[in-house]
Amino acid sequence: MNKLGDTLKQLLVLCVMLWIGVLETQAEEFRIRVMSYNIYRGGTMHGQPLSQTAKVIREAKADIVGLQEPRSPKGFNTERLAKILGWNHSANIRKGIVLTPHEIVANFAGGIKVKLPSGQHAYVFSLHLPSNPYQPYQLLGIRPKWHKHWDTPFIKTEVEAIEAARKARGGEVSGLLNQIRDLPDKEAAVFVVGDFNEPSHLDWTEEAAVAGRHPMKVEYPHSKAMSKAGFADAYRTVYPDEMKHPGYTWSPMYKTDDPSTHHDRIDFVYFQGRSVKLIGARVIGENEENADVVVSPYPSDHRAVVAEFMLSKPTPRTEK
């Protein structure tokens, strides 16, 4: 009987120790969903209330959102949207906007430093890069009716596309990457989200060109710049096959075969950090054919993308 009692005590102690270990692991990890969302002219241009834009964010179950195009014809809707959600927003309500229910402990040009409930910190930057000249339209000879730049030249080669993209967006991307390199906390998670107004070299591949999806292979410079700087593209990491999972975010306003546009993936969630583990990524949009999460009616001309991550407290580096 004593041996049985001792065995039961040992099992009880073991169970308690295992339970404590589980609790400690949970305390050292935190799950977040980071979203990039161009809300299209303040979120109300389709005649829908701003609450529908808030619904998109809620349905995505995001808790950090990089926002683009907050300005409506009546003014900037950043503060209104944050109020509907009951969230905090970055100090700049016009550009580099980030919304989150978590505590914002610092504001930067184009982003924030956020404190998570786990005590961990993360940096989040939101980009909205210039849309003109837009290389897919230049290569395909497209001038949409709504386009203001009727003098934009058409181009024919990959070299021309790369050069035009660098000229249009290179300064902003380089500036942001320099800013990130100067961050004091080298161990913290860093997220860069936004409407890049430029496709990815991971999508405009030789295979995609041969299949007729895109007019040619293009090594777009700024997706490559993000990769060179140590960032990973969340959606394309989860879905590496660009042919099976195009992940188009531009644009739900057009039919697939509409010759006045070209469907593409130009909205991204990039991530970096030893403590960051990617769990999944989804597109939010207007129907099941084009999105993983459906919100109808859909209030924007861009589909949103949200990625889920597990953040763990980084282990100290050991010197060799």
Language model feature labels by segment:
Residues V65-Q68, A91-N92, L99, F191-D195, ...:
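Active-site neighborhood of phospho(di)ester-bond hydrolases with catalytic His/Asp-centered motifs
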Residues N107-P117, R181-V190, N197-K320:
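Metal-dependent phosphoester-hydrolase catalytic domains
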Residues A165-V193:
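His/acidic metal-ligating clusters that form di-metal
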